[in-house]
Amino acid sequence: MSRIRKPEVHVRGQQPPGGVERARLRASAAAFTSLVALAATGLVAGPAVGAPSAGPCALPRTSAHHSLGLDTWNGAYPQPVRTLDAVMVFLSFPDSTPLTAPAELAADHFPGTSDFFRRASYGRFALRAHAQPEWTVMPKDSTDYAIRRDWAAGKRTEYLRDAVAAADRKVDFSRYDIVYLVADPDAPGVDSDATKVVNLEHPVTADGKDIKRVVTVFERHPPDRNVLAHETGHVFDLPDLYHRPMDGKGDWDTHVGDWDVMGSQFGLAPEPFGWHKWKLGWLERSQVVCVQGPGSRLFSLEPLAAAPVAGGTLGNRLAVVRTGPGTALAIEARGATGNDRDTCKEGVLIYRVRNEAASGEGPIEVVDAHPRTEACWDRSVYPPLADAPLGVGETLTVADDGTRVEVADRTAAGAWTVKVTVPPPSL
């Protein structure tokens, strides 16, 4: 697609012991003054807290940024297994009169983003947005901040400092888990490619609340599809799955194509991978088939994006073969329902997971079951992977480890019968 992906930014800062209370938030300028941009490979580390699940197929979490290890949860991030409240602050500038009302901009993203996560989490997570009804006026012209995708650290610091100070006059930050700073899309200095999550190595405390990260939104009106779902995924410790070419040119979607919103917000099948759902706590261990070899195992997989039957159990949504200390093969069924309603092809999708690969460095790679063909060239972000899933009667032996995946049948209810054979370990 034509839009350039927007990696996260990590920012260092210093703040006085005890943070900045509401009555003293003007001191937030001092807290931000020394902020310096940190390379995108930096970490916002946190304590390990309650594991989403464990077992022989759960890879351990590593120090990689947004590691896909899931034996423990990174306590620096809110886990989306309850209701989380988000504030939307709308920022205007002296050099431009907004052409769009805050309510219209809020409607660009909500309830759509909340609905996306409600479906993806099977109702386990609710994102509740609180949109400020009026514009918050920034102290400087939009052009003064030099907003762009690869933003100069000093200018980004200035923007964040001014935004927090201006918003604090109206916002009680202690009430919110997530902060969205939404800029006037028609201001002359606003660049829509600058939308991203900004992580603060040293949180700024307002109203007794540590602000560890903010989502800076510079989208057009109307915005890119699912853009806020993608950015909010970072707030929950999910990595970028796209591949950024070294020269900034070429295709960004070679790792996962249309599959998962963290690969492309434009994708035809944006439902989060089953591995992501397992990490976030949306899948229980009982809904993950751990295939241990050598030998074969036959089981059924329900479509990942299918809503649970009222009064029924969720059923198997993911199968995993552990292939190494930090690697695994994941297998899931994808169907044209829910967030995947526009998918190019239904079937059983296979992908590799690496727990030591950082965000944007290939933590997930889809295995193409049809490497000589492509599909949906007029709609797909990466047609070579649009037909990656296996169909009924098809078999794939995965290179490197030799695991064989066979799709034996599909039931009338839509579940896929899958046989996985794990070879003996090589000598």
Language model regions located:
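Extracellular hydrolytic enzyme modules, especially secreted metalloproteases
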Residues: F173, I178, D186-D340
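Zn2+-dependent metallopeptidase catalytic core
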Residues: V49-H221, A229, D247, E406
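Secretory targeting and sorting signals
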Residues: R3-I4, G18-A51
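Non-catalytic C-terminal accessory/binding modules of secreted extracellular proteins
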Residues: R3-K6, L59-L70, E201-P203, D207-F218, ...
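Short, polar loop/linker segments at the starts of domains and inter-domain junctions
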Residues: L99-P111, P272-K279, K345, E365
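Active-site-proximal beta-strand/loop segments in catalytic clefts of secreted hydrolases
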Residues: V89-P94, V182-D186, L238-L241, S264-G267, ...
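Short, solvent-exposed loop/turn elements at domain surfaces
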Residues: D95-A101, A269-G274, N339-R341, S359
